[in-house]
């Protein structure tokens, strides 16, 4: 198993980490190496424990570095004059990809954000004159400004900016989707499809992988739930199979915790 990197964010004072540790171990080793084979999952445990984990199975070293940002940092969405500006409300610790943008992080309120690859992502909308938000700082914008998933969904659903998506340093297209989770266990998935932002929100949004889009992942997962994970689970490293396995383990251990 080729695990390039992982992030585990624990937001709870509970001393009972046995189930969380078991879940994390299963999660990390169920994901064979792939070119863009990342998986994000949220464990909802006893005593309001919330654990968000993701793998970073990228085809090369993403040159990750950790940064600690305080409150009160002034930022711009892009170098363009037509951009949004803000001052960070919350401090955060983040992982940068290629040292040019925030891929993952958690702010001081327990909001976690994770960017994963999604081939179907399309940010372009014809004749779009909205202010620009660079894809490299989109995740940081969320961590800087919102304490909960509800807050983030309420603001991002207004679609007041457009996403600029330059190619990655290795020449790959920066087609990404974003997941967030908060200290209450709520989650949301954000995908830009044909220039429009599609949002899925709820505690049940515990898993995100890669292609296909989230709505199609749910349809495929429904099929496997009819079979039953204790009977058979799909075993390849395809994103849809990883989604099914992670969903099964999330449900299994969340049910045990309850």
Language model features with spans:
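Bacterial N-terminal signal peptides that target proteins for export
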Residues: 11-21
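Secretory/export targeting leaders with adjacent low-complexity proregions
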Residues: 149-180
